[in-house]
Amino acid sequence: MIKRIQDRDEKQKIARQVLEGLTEWFEVEESREGYISDCKDWIFFAAEEDGHYAGFLCLKETGKETVELAVMGVLKEYHRNGIGRQLVEKAKEEAASLGYSFMQVKTVKMGVYEDYDRTNRFYLACGFKEFEVIETYWDEANPCQIYVMSLA
């Protein structure tokens, strides 16, 4: 079940639980802690399975008509069960109902790391379209792929 979380402390607790279980994607502690800290101020959705949280997704406004899928994680034992897609669908519905026209997401470009190749394929399967690659957005070893989606 996907639900929107409003409580700031609960948002951080869920984010910490999930992100600390996904160190392949969130191995840099400083970045991980940044997401955990910042998520309290973002639109936050959590996936609950069997009485505990299996994943979450956060949206942040990046423009008058655009939100960014700022961070998302689903615990590995729940991968390939549709939870990520459910989170994205709920985020799309909510963003559209709030009047946003576009959603974007940033990830490491396809072809750099196998784990991120799976992430890229997931975003494409959810309906995101390739927008731009910024080779040095993060650093040269991690070129940034930006995907966008119309919510109209």
Q: What feature does the model see in each segment?
A:
Residues 80-97, 118-121:
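Conserved acetyl-CoA-binding loop-helix of GNAT-fold acetyltransferases
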Residues 95-114:
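Conserved GNAT acetyl-CoA-binding A-motif
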Residues 123, 128:
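Conserved active-site tyrosine of GNAT-family acetyltransferases
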Residues 65-76, 80, 104-106:
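Conserved acetyl-CoA binding element of GNAT-fold acetyltransferases
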Residues 42, 142-146:
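Short hydrophobic/aromatic beta-strand or adjacent loop that forms the aromatic wall/cage
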Residues 1-30:
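Short amphipathic alpha-helix that is part of the acyltransferase structural core
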Residues 46, 52-60, 66-73:
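Conserved beta-strand in the GNAT
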Residues 114-119, 133-143:
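Short glycine/proline-centered loop/turn elements that form peptide/ligand docking sites
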